[in-house]
Amino acid sequence: MGLWLSLCGAVVVVAYLLGSFPTGYIAVKQLKGIDIREVGSGSTGATNVLRTLGKGPGAFVLGLDCLKGVLAIALVDYLFNFATSQNLIPTTVNVQLWQPWLVTLAGIAAILGHSKSIFLGFTGGKSVATSLGILLAMNWQVGLATFGVFAVVVAISRIVSLSSIMGAIAVSIVMVVLQQPLPYILFGIAGGLYVILRHRSNIERLLAGTEPKIGQKLTTETEQSA
């Protein structure tokens, strides 16, 4: 059991490190020579990269951040497949019960890694794209439904933060409707709340009517309050 618990713990740590990989920071540093945390909203996520570098780099970072979430969950699947083939799973372990919980822990670790990166002094992004990758890997129907909510809201409002918040609210509802395992539902609730909390400054700007739409940049006054 000790070896099994160590393997599970290692997967969670690696998931955090995957989430911590600072794609947005590296992209802006390499292409523009500046620290993205010092411009715009200060976030290292795809939206701030979009405002700083444009659509191409923004889409690239979005894809990589999403991939980080997918890989974090794929690690869990790989562990169970490898451990099963090598007879490393103790007979007392119920795989059907353990796997959803470990998937959830790895997902939470990746989200925390993206927003609190060990490589950036525990700063980072708002974990939206990484969360989407996790959801798609957990259950593609949940991921697509959540992305659908995001897409509809962004098409109507042209405000990414509002769309992200609405998607975060929708996750747990979609999880319940599609009868997902309890750990996944708890992930939807906890992850959704965390993403919303990461958007506190955006919510303040939304209420004040100063949140920029796609294609607009934050004003100097807004940047200073972000």
Curated annotation (Swiss-Prot):
Membrane-crossing segments per the record: 1-21, 56-76, 102-122, 134-154, 159-178, 182-197
- EC number(s) on record? 2.3.1.275
Its predominant location is membrane
**Pathway terms, separated by semicolons:** Lipid metabolism; phospholipid metabolism
- A Pfam match: G3P_acyltransf
Keywords attached to this Swiss-Prot or TrEMBL record, sorted alphabetically, are: Cell inner membrane, Cell membrane, Lipid biosynthesis, Lipid metabolism, Membrane, Phospholipid biosynthesis, Phospholipid metabolism, Transferase, Transmembrane, Transmembrane helix
Classification via InterPro entries:
G3P_acylTferase_PlsY (IPR003811)
Membrane topology reported for the UniProt record: Multi-pass membrane protein
* GO cellular component terms attached to this protein's record: plasma membrane
Report the GO molecular function annotations.
acyl-phosphate glycerol-3-phosphate acyltransferase activity
Superkingdom of this protein's organism? Bacteria
Q: Can you list the disulfide-bonded cysteine pairs?
A: none
Which HAMAP family did the record assign?
PlsY (MF_01043)
Similarity comment text for this entry: Belongs to the PlsY family.
> Its biological function?
Catalyzes the transfer of an acyl group from acyl-phosphate (acyl-PO(4)) to glycerol-3-phosphate (G3P) to form lysophosphatidic acid (LPA). This enzyme utilizes acyl-phosphate as fatty acyl donor, but not acyl-CoA or acyl-ACP.
What's the protein here called?
Glycerol-3-phosphate acyltransferase
The encoding gene: plsY
